[in-house]
Amino acid sequence: MVVCAAAVLALTLFFKVESVEVTGNSRYSAQEIQDACGVQLGDNLYLLSKPDMVQRLHQRLPYIDEVRITRSLPNTLRVQVTEFTTVYAVEQEGTVWLLTSGGKIVETAAERGDVPLIDGCELLAPSLSGDVSFALELQNRQESLFALLTALESAELTGDVRAIHLGDPTVLSMDYTERFSVEMPYSADYPRLLRYLTLVIEELETNLTGVIDLTRDGEPHFRPN
């Protein structure tokens, strides 16, 4: 018991936070991240709760995606973050809601600007740092949307997306670059369809515009304008 008490006393007296090192940040400053964590210089390094700090970061700084917090003895706390860089816009009742490919609402805006638009859906009770939710009857469209956004991100194709349309109950369509409308089914293998899309575009003349139909399994079709 004496040894345990001495160990606890040592942890309390020593290992005070003298510096907080933040890496991976661009949108938020290191000080903003430290403040959001709730860490102050002089706090005990071992009495800080890492799960609580991660939760506060996600709640207070919506663009934070992944967080890794480590202790570096004797007195440094390291916070490594990744931030969401691609967002999409849903316009609803005069407000533009910006959301990530993972379905997190990160910001509101008065105007959409050049952010890719998602239409044909309605957000239920949207709130900052909250998760996107569609009406129950649109759950299939919601799941398909975020499966597509995840696939676009993995394929590094997000920069060419101009808009995604969910208004048609049978076909999900996407405005891609300034040249194409891409038609896809809901609940599809989107990584595979995006590979088809890339191959089709590579075969087309650079001045062609039109519709790329990916709704027929394994048989892409191009309809020129």
Regions found by a protein language model. Name each.
Residues 3-7, 15-26, 46-99, 146-149:
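Periplasmic polypeptide-binding modules associated with outer-membrane biogenesis and secretion
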Residues 16-18, 29, 53, 60-65, ...:
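Envelope-exposed proteins and targeting segments
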Residues 23-63, 114-143, 187, 192, ...:
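Periplasmic/extracytosolic POTRA-like scaffold domains at the N-termini of outer-membrane
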Residues 24-26, 37, 81-85, 110, ...:
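Flexible glycine-/small-residue-rich
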Residues 42-44, 65-66, 75-76, 85-88, ...:
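Short beta-strands and strand-coil junctions in structured, solvent-facing domains, enriched
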Residues 82-161:
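Extracytoplasmic segments of membrane-associated envelope/inner-membrane machinery
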Residues 137-192, 198:
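Soluble extracytoplasmic domains of inner/organellar membrane proteins
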Residues 178-225:
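Extracytoplasmic/luminal low-complexity segments enriched in Pro/Gly and acidic/polar residues
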